[in-house]
């Protein structure tokens, strides 16, 4: 009886938000760039729900702010047809983990480094670096 009650109570507790590993965080970002259902092929949404799920508090408001971007930073292009995505941990340094991501987008090789932190909600993105820019700088530059 006590076990059944404990299982029932555990079932009523909301599941913890966030991602359990840096790799799962990055995989879930790129799930929005697939070629399946329309809600999963339009890129990462620019709404508060997606911002809260994927980004640290300092980056959330920049992600949802109105702006005119020449391309989607996460795929380095205004359109996409992604090939296989390679995800690997570059290094763990204090509270940050650096995750390398490489893929082919319409015949062009793309490499990005995700800087992720493990916060109270799980793993979230603190910044993303391309060879020429960072997501924070990109969003600030193209803000309205």
Where are these regions (language model features)?
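Sec-dependent signal peptide recognition
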Residues: 1-7
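Hydrophobic h-region of N-terminal signal peptides that target proteins for export
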Residues: 8-17
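Surface-exposed patches in mature extracellular/periplasmic domains of secreted proteins
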Residues: 37-47
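Stable alpha-helical elements in mature extracytoplasmic
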Residues: 21-26, 47, 51, 55
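Low-complexity, intrinsically disordered terminal/linker segments enriched in charged
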Residues: 92-96, 106-109, 127-144
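Surface-exposed, charged secondary-structure patches
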Residues: 18-19, 52-108
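Short, aromatic-enriched amphipathic alpha-helices that serve as compact interaction elements
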Residues: 20-38
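Hydrophobic/aromatic beta-strand elements that line small-molecule binding cavities or substrate pockets
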Residues: 112-117
């Amino acid at each position: 009886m006590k076990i059944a009650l404990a299982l029932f109570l555990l079932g009523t507790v909301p599941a913890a938000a966030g991602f359990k590993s840096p790799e799962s965080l990055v995989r879930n970002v790129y799930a929005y760039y697939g070629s399946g259902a329309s809600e999963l092929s339009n890129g990462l949404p620019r709404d508060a729900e997606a911002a809260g799920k994927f980004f640290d508090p300092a980056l959330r408001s920049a992600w949802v702010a109105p702006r005119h971007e020449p391309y989607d930073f996460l795929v380095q292009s205004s359109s996409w047809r992604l090939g296989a995505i390679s995800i690997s941990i570059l290094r763990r340094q204090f509270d940050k983990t650096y995750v390398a991501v490489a893929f082919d987008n319409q015949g062009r090789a793309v490499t990005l480094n995700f800087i992720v932190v493990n916060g109270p909600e799980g793993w979230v993105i603190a910044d993303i670096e391309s060879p020429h820019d960072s997501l924070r700088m990109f969003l600030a530059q193209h803000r309205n």
